[in-house]
A protein has these predicted regions:
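Conserved polymerase palm-domain catalytic core
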Residues: 2, 6-113, 117-153, 158
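Active-site and adjacent loop segments of nucleotide-processing enzymes
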Residues: 160-167
Length: 167
């Protein structure tokens, strides 16, 4: 990751671009992945790692780290606060990042861990994006959006992103 400050700066920069410096409405779709670390599918994660890493020793090492996590839900989850977990969730979520940018063609997308925003001047466009996002997360990554944490609002109404309210 590149840190909260970069994400916050990009948020402001994107909001300025989408709103054409406050000359038009900037809509923001804000979402949160439900039980993020606990829901990471270990098999899917290893398959993603195998697509990017050819060295079998490295793959085995990552597999051991992933499988060392004791969970009530077998084959699911990564330990919170572990440095390798932070790297691995970004490897995992990179699949989603690529989908949002290249398949959904969303230029103004920012993700920080399990929180993400997509900005657009067209509210209906963002409404149409929601089922696509849900389907991809569900089918490809076995993740779900937190049902109470999907918000569609204008930037001027004040958007809480990463603990900072932007308007």
């Amino acid at each position: 990751g590149k840190g909260t400050h970069r994400a916050l700066n990009r948020f402001r920069q994107f909001a300025r671009k989408v709103s054409k410096s406050n000359k038009r409405t900037c809509w923001i779709l804000k979402c949160d992945v439900r039980k993020f670390f606990a829901s990471i599918d270990q098999t899917t994660l290893i398959q993603i790692v195998e697509r990017h890493i050819s060295d079998p020793d490295t793959i085995r090492l990552i597999q051991r780290v992933v499988e060392s996590f004791e969970s009530t839900d077998v084959g699911k989850g990564l330990p919170l606060g572990n440095l390798t977990s932070q790297l691995l969730v970004n490897v995992y979520m990179n699949e989603f990042d690529q989908f949002v940018k290249h398949v959904l063609k969303q230029k103004y997308y920012i993700r920080y861990a399990d929180d993400f925003v997509i900005m657009h001047h067209n509210k209906n466009m963002l409404i149409k994006v929601i089922p696509n996002v849900q389907n991809f997360l569900d089918e490809k990554l076995k993740l779900t959006l937190h049902p109470n944490k999907v918000f569609l609002q204008t930037v001027t109404s004040g958007v809480d992103f990463l603990g900072w309210v932007h308007f």
